[in-house]
A protein has these predicted regions:
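Conserved catalytic-loop position in the HRD/HxD motif
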Residues: 77
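Short, glycine/acidic-enriched loop or turn micro-motifs at the edges of active sites
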Residues: 53, 80-81
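Long, charge-rich alpha-helical interaction segments
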Residues: 110-118
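Short beta-strand scaffold segments in enzyme catalytic cores
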Residues: 83-87
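Nucleotide/phosphate-binding catalytic cleft detector across ATP-hydrolyzing
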Residues: 1-73, 92-107, 119, 128-183
Length: 183
C-alpha cells in the first residue's frame, strides 16, 4: 500500500553480514516493481545481522534500552536453515564473536525423516508432521497409527549440540554476558 519507504531494514545471516551488507543495501535501495503495475521506492536501506533486531525488540519491549546499551548480550537465532548467534556490546555487533552455521531445524527434520524411512521401510518425508510432533509432543500418524518418535529425539539433540558447541568456540568471554536472548 505504500509507494515510498524512507528506511527499509533487512537482515542477513551473521556469517554473510560483512561480505554482503553493502551489496544488499544497494540492491534494496531505489525503485522496485511489486506487481500489478505498482512500484515502491526505497530511499535508504540498512542491513543488519539477523539476530540484531531481536536485541532491539527485547530492549524496547522490556524498557531496558539504557541498561542493555551498557551490557554485553548474546542473541541466539536457531532458524530453519541456519543457526545464528550474535554477541553485542551495547547495541553494537561484536563481529569476531558472532557467526552462523548451516545447521537448522531442516537438518533435524531430515534426520528424523530418514530414521523413520529406515524404520518403516518406505520413503517418509512429511516434514510438517515431524515438526508438529516435535512442537506439541503428539505422535505423528503414519499408516493410520501413532508413531513413537521418542527413539529418534537423540538425532535432534545431536544437531543442537553441534550448533551450540560451535557457538561456544566463538564466544571469548561467556562469563561476561549479562543477557542471553533466544529468538
Amino acid at each position: 500500500k505504500l509507494s515510498h519507504i524512507d528506511l527499509l531494514v533487512v537482515g542477513l545471516p551473521v556469517a554473510l553480514f560483512a561480505v554482503k551488507k553493502a551489496a544488499l543495501e544497494k540492491a534494496m535501495t531505489g525503485k522496485h516493481d511489486v506487481g500489478d503495475g505498482k512500484t515502491v521506492t526505497v530511499a535508504k536501506a540498512l542491513a543488519v545481522a539477523q539476530p540484531q533486531g531481536a536485541l532491539v525488540h527485547y530492549a524496547s519491549v522490556h524498557q531496558k534500552m539504557a541498561e542493555i546499551g551498557k551490557e554485553q548480550s548474546l542473541i541466539i537465532d536457531p532458524g530453519s536453515r541456519t543457526f545464528d548467534w550474535l554477541v553485542a556490546q551495547g547495541m553494537r555487533l561484536v563481529q569476531k564473536q558472532s557467526h552462523s552455521i548451516n545447521r537448522g531445524m531442516s537438518d533435524v527434520l531430515r534426520l528424523i525423516a530418514h530414521a523413520i524411512t529406515k524404520d518403516i521401510g518406505t520413503p517418509y518425508r512429511d516434514y510438517d508432521a515431524i515438526d508438529l510432533a516435535l512442537r506439541t509432543g503428539k505422535s505423528p500418524v503414519i499408516y493410520q497409527k501413532a508413531y513413537d518418535m521418542s527413539r529418534h529425539l537423540a538425532l535432534a539433540d545431536s544437531v543442537a549440540q553441534q550448533a551450540v558447541s560451535t557457538m561456544r568456540e566463538w564466544i571469548e568471554s561467556p562469563h561476561s554476558l549479562q543477557n542471553i536472548i533466544l529468538v
